[in-house]
Amino acid sequence: MVEDSIGNETVNQESTYSLPFWCTKGTKLRDFQFKLLHTRRITSNDFLYKIGIKQSNSCTFCGEATENLVYLFWSCKHSNAFWKDCYQWIMQNTSKIENFNLSEALLFGLINNAKDLLRHHLLLIARHYIYTCKQRDTRPNVRMYIHIVQRTVKIERQIAKGHNSLDTFKKKSPRLKTSPF
């Protein structure tokens, strides 16, 4: 088992790279997480500015600082507010999710264990949503995120039905109180 430390947290690399395959059947989310972990595949304005594609290296959401991946996904006041709203929604609308602390490592999918696949799935959807907002030049908001979660759950249910794994799906998704079924 390969482990690294980020801040005060220990990261299990094997679990980190396997996590998207455990928590979702959606290839779009799996692909996104893989690209995020290989930082040059998910680009920030800082990188795009350096190679001459963008006119500015400023944050897409606030325009107040240089946009690198940590700033985009964590430090920007708009991303940070979204994460707080997202956390509150997750805690209010799921059952059996232990209280957890928002941290850079967790929000990037860098984990020391994969105990709660529903939580990791919801955070993966949130990461992908933030990046989609960057691409569309819009700010993330929790109402749209909730809509995306509901749509994703419907898709995951259809995939589970097609693969005769509905029982496994039902163990995870009914814990989501806003489940669309």
Language-model-derived ranges and their functions:
Residues 2-181:
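Family-specific functional microsites
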